[in-house]
Design a protein with these regions (language model features):
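Alpha-helical recognition/docking segments in bacterial nutrient-uptake
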Residues: 56-170, 174, 235, 239
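N-terminal helix-turn-helix DNA-binding module of bacterial transcription factors
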Residues: 1-57
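Hydrophobic alpha-helical segments within soluble ligand-binding/sensing domains
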Residues: 155-182, 198-202, 223-233, 251
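Short, surface-exposed alpha-helical segments at coil->helix boundaries
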Residues: 32, 74-78, 166, 193-201
């Protein structure tokens, strides 16, 4: 069964079938329903690599989200949905575990779904060094800088994680705290965590304090993981008076552990 066979049985053109399979809105409900009934009946899966199929780019924008507990990413997705509402574009949101390789997933999604562009919400910059040349659509990386990678199809939007972390820890020092714990991500998996930890260290040094590795608790960017990390820190009997958490959800988890 090919897309041509689907078109013949449905009584519509190949281009109409293609628009339905790509999630386009410019198709009547009658045509969409008939075509999808046939697709489901034959359990048809488009073969995007077959030479006889026309290679098309869908009108979908792919968002690859690292982790499922980031409140900031949820807000960003809502704004994007509001922005494209009523346009010819559709949004495909795909969640990944924070340990996953988002670039490998982007390569797979490009091959199977042919999005017109990709937005990476979170990521490990190391993965972009390795396989990003296989991604051939415009992309934007959020939360890390891509300007030094040298890819013409990759732009980025990010904050200065190091400066922001330094300011946050400065605030704690300015309010009299000296025994400060830090809860953040795994350095090997999270590029922003590296910069935020460096910013925290810079603040410690500026205020004449040594940053001890025992002050840093590694956690996933989730409520439960931060909760457990804070409990481990409390169980260590350290005289902690303040905590710098590297994300909102981590802060909530740490607060819950303290209150418990």
């Amino acid at each position: 069964m090919t897309i041509v066979d689907i078109a013949k049985e449905a009584g519509y053109s190949v281009s109409t079938v293609s628009r339905v399979l790509n999630g386009r809105r410019d198709v009547s409900e009658e045509a969409r329903d008939r075509i999808m009934r046939i697709v489901e009946a034959y359990q048809f899966v488009p073969n995007n690599n077959a030479k006889h199929l026309k290679q098309t780019v869908s009108q979908s924008i792919l968002i690859l989200v690292k982790g499922t507990s980031n409140m900031l990413f949820t807000n960003i997705i809502e704004v994007i949905q509001d922005t494209i509402e009523g346009s010819d574009y559709s949004l495909r949101v795909h969640y990944l575990d924070e340990d996953a390789d988002e670039v490998k997933e982007a390569v797979r999604m490009c091959r199977e779904h042919k999005p017109m562009g990709i937005l990476f919400l979170g990521g490990n910059i190391q993965y972009f060094h390795e396989e990003f040349e296989l991604v051939n659509v415009p992309c934007v990386l959020v939360t890390d800088r891509a300007d030094k990678l040298g890819f013409r199809n990759l732009a980025s939007v990010s904050t200065d994680d190091m400066a922001a972390a330094e300011m946050a820890v400065d605030y704690l020092f300015d309010h009299g705290h000296r025994d400060i714990a830090v809860i953040g991500g795994d350095m090997a998996l999270s590029s922003p965590s590296k910069y935020r930890k460096a910013g925290a260290k810079r603040s410690f040094i500026k205020h004449g304090c040594e940053f001890e590795e025992e002050s840093y608790a590694v956690a996933r960017f989730s409520y439960e993981s931060a909760y457990n990390a804070m409990n481990r820190m409390l169980a260590s009997k350290r005289s902690i008076t303040a905590v710098f958490a590297m994300s909102d959800v981590m802060a909530v988890g740490a607060m819950r552990a303290i209150f418990d």
